[in-house]
Amino acid sequence: MELSDQEWKHVLDIWTKVESKLPEHGHEVIIRLLQEHPETQERFEKFKHMKTADEMKSSEKMKQHGNTVFTALGNILKQKGNHAEVLKPLAKSHALEHKIPVKYLEFISEIIVKVIAEKYPADFGADSQAAMRKALELFRNDMASKYKEFGYQG
């Protein structure tokens, strides 16, 4: 699966806007992931004790993690699909250390699209959303391939 130059333009144009508030957007995505898919919370040792949205919103550690997630994702997206070297350490840690199933990457991908659409409705129309979904699918597929290389079936 490849994205066209125009699709990458859509992805990177909106990502430029997202980067202006990376910690906030990343934090919101992590909160929504844990709320909409509570089963994912067990994979986060430092967050599994949090039960309320208020606890999550006030967590500096969760905000930092959201920033880490979005920083890594931005680095991957900017590679325009040529992300094998950037992806390898991420896939290794997610497969062997954190044991994050690919299904959870699907969950967070959809939440990322929703949050960006809510924050930037005028700049993230149907074509941009479709391009982002495609870029995130490429990321997930490549993560799944790397998982298999590391012997994790996730």
UniProtKB/Swiss-Prot annotation:
Where on this chain does O2 bind?
Answer: H65
Can you give the residue ranges of the Globin domain? Answer: 2-148
Annotated Gene Ontology cellular component terms: extracellular exosome; sarcoplasm
Which Pfam families is this protein grouped with?
A: Globin
Give the reaction(s) catalysed: Fe(III)-heme b-[protein] + nitric oxide + H2O = Fe(II)-heme b-[protein] + nitrite + 2 H(+); H2O2 + AH2 = A + 2 H2O
The Gene Ontology biological process terms listed for this entry are:
removal of superoxide radicals
Q: Which InterPro entries does the protein's record reference?
A: Globin, Globin-like_sf, Myoglobin
The UniProt keywords, alphabetically, are:
Cytoplasm, Heme, Iron, Metal-binding, Muscle protein, Oxidoreductase, Oxygen transport, Transport
Query: Where is it mainly found?
Result: cytoplasm
Function in brief: Monomeric heme protein which primary function is to store oxygen and facilitate its diffusion within muscle tissues. Reversibly binds oxygen through a pentacoordinated heme iron and enables its timely and efficient release as needed during periods of heightened demand. Depending on the oxidative conditions of tissues and cells, and in addition to its ability to bind oxygen, it also has a nitrite reductase activity whereby it regulates the production of bioactive nitric oxide.
Protein name (Swiss-Prot/TrEMBL): Myoglobin
Look up and give the organism this protein is from: Alligator mississippiensis
**What taxonomic lineage is listed for the species of origin?**
Eukaryota, Metazoa, Chordata, Craniata, Vertebrata
